[in-house]
């Protein structure tokens, strides 16, 4: 029986790419934000008559990319792995490389399952700024 692997790429804040990995990979990109990633994954699995229990594993892109998007996609996949025992294969992918080219360059038989949770690789350091508002959310006067 042929193995079924899910492909999940949540590098981009405005899109989620999902796929089934086989001789001819099937890829679909959903133009949604992280708040719709789980809904998109559910719809994708339903459309292709799959469930997490029927999958042999998932190849998950860990970055680099948007911090918010990666936290969303990895939280979903880490939760599925924890609750269902789904094997996760974490891999970095250059953001400019197409998903199809990336998938075709891999040998799935040589990817070891990650131990524990997958962790994101961010595109840059966090950009934390000070607020210009007080505790009541009023603009502070300029000094």
Regions found by a protein language model. Give the residues of each.
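Oxyanion-binding and handling regions
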Residues: 1-39, 47-52, 83-143
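Residues at secondary-structure transition points
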Residues: 32-35, 67, 71
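Short HxH-centered metal-ligating active-site micro-motif
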Residues: 44-47, 51-64
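DPxDG-like acidic metal-binding loop motif
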Residues: 57-62, 68-86
């Amino acid at each position: 029986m042929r193995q079924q692997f899910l492909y999940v790429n949540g590098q981009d804040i405005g899109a989620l790419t999902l796929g089934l990995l086989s001789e001819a990979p099937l890829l679909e990109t959903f133009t949604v934000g992280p708040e719709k990633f789980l809904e998109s994954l559910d719809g994708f699995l339903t459309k292709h008559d799959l469930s997490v229990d029927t999958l042999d594993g998932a190849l998950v892109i860990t970055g680099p990319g948007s911090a918010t998007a990666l936290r969303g996609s990895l939280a979903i996949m880490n939760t599925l792995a924890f609750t269902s025992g789904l094997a996760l294969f974490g891999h970095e992918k250059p953001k400019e490389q197409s998903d199809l080219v990336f998938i075709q360059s891999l040998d799935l038989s040589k990817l070891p399952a990650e131990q524990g949770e997958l962790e994101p690789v961010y595109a840059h350091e966090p950009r934390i700024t000070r607020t210009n508002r007080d505790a009541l959310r009023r603009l502070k006067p300029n000094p």
